[in-house]
Amino acid sequence: MYRPEKNSIRKVTMQREDLIQSMFAPPEAPPVRWRIAPAPVDYQEAVETMEREAADIAAGTADELVWLVEHPPLYTAGTSANAADLVIPDRFPVFATGRGGEYTYHGPGQRVVYVMLDLKRRRQDVRAFVAALESVIIATLDSMNVKGERREDRVGVWVRRPEKPPLMDGTVAEDKIAAIGIRLRRWVSFHGLSLNVDPDLEHFDGIVPCGIRGHGVTSLVDLGLPVMMADVDIRLREAFEMVFGPTRSETNGIGTARLESE
């Protein structure tokens, strides 16, 4: 799920799992800023911040940034969103967004990771970048003894649920635990990924998540892991550094919105 700007797609026929090579910046590049918002962030404020930061990174006036946030309950519609997939349109606010993909949910208990990296200094390959983001999630889950998997026909990270009834075709049921939706402008990424830590999974009922029917959603707590967001953040950072290289802490996270659930 991505929306690159014009002329930014390279034709690649390899599977995503085969695309993982080096996504490190050159050795002389400064570490990526790692920012954690101290309070919930209004979605429109987040978009404006990403737009500004991505422009500064492209201009060479700011270092790359990873920004971890939570949002109040809301739905976002990507550039491929089908109106029929918004099942309960008045449940939460709905935001049209420039990222690729379809409908998704953000809310309390979900870690949203906005990734603003300059792929010109890393690797100008959109599919490889998406695969690298999946690898960050998979490594994060692996550190908690959860096996996350990618699927070639579905972007994101999935967890098998053998304890659930099998699918109609007899295969093992599987739920989505993390979603990815990105956009590129001048080869700088923004938007990013979301990992379900302990959101209210019933809030996903208002949409067909990512336009994919027949599969459910899950979270770390739903899988039986009583984890805290701060613990997940540490593991996310370690996994990110394995894939993309060093980071440095930044403390001026932005957060103003209130977390309000139905």
Curated annotation (Swiss-Prot):
CDD domains: LipB. One of its GO terms (biological process) is protein modification process. It is found in: Cytoplasm. Its EC number is 2.3.1.181. Residues 60-248 form the BPL/LPL catalytic domain. One of its GO terms (molecular function) is lipoyl(octanoyl) transferase activity. The keyword Protein biosynthesis does not apply. Its main location: cytoplasm. The record marks 176 as: Lowers pKa of active site Cys. Substrate binds at residues 99-106, 179-181, 192-194. Gene3D superfamilies: Bira Bifunctional Protein, Domain 2 (3.30.930.10). Disulfide bonds: none annotated. InterPro entries: aa-tRNA-synth_II/BPL/LPL (IPR045864), BPL_LPL_catalytic (IPR004143), Octanoyltransferase (IPR000544), Octanoyltransferase_CS (IPR020605). The keyword Transmembrane helix does not apply. Pathway: Protein modification; protein lipoylation via endogenous pathway; protein N(6)-(lipoyl)lysine from octanoyl-[acyl-carrier-protein]: step 1/2. Keywords: Acyltransferase, Cytoplasm, Transferase. It catalyses: octanoyl-[ACP] + L-lysyl-[protein] = N(6)-octanoyl-L-lysyl-[protein] + holo-[ACP] + H(+). It comes from the Bacteria. The active site is at residue 210. GO terms for cellular component: cytoplasm. In the reaction, the free carboxyl group of octanoic acid is attached via an amide linkage to the epsilon-amino group of a specific lysine residue of lipoyl domains of lipoate-dependent enzymes. Belongs to the LipB family. Catalyzes the transfer of endogenously produced octanoic acid from octanoyl-acyl-carrier-protein onto the lipoyl domains of lipoate-dependent enzymes. Lipoyl-ACP can also act as a substrate although octanoyl-ACP is likely to be the physiological substrate. This is Octanoyltransferase. It comes from Sinorhizobium medicae (strain WSM419). The lineage of its organism: Bacteria, Pseudomonadati, Pseudomonadota, Alphaproteobacteria, Hyphomicrobiales. The gene is lipB.
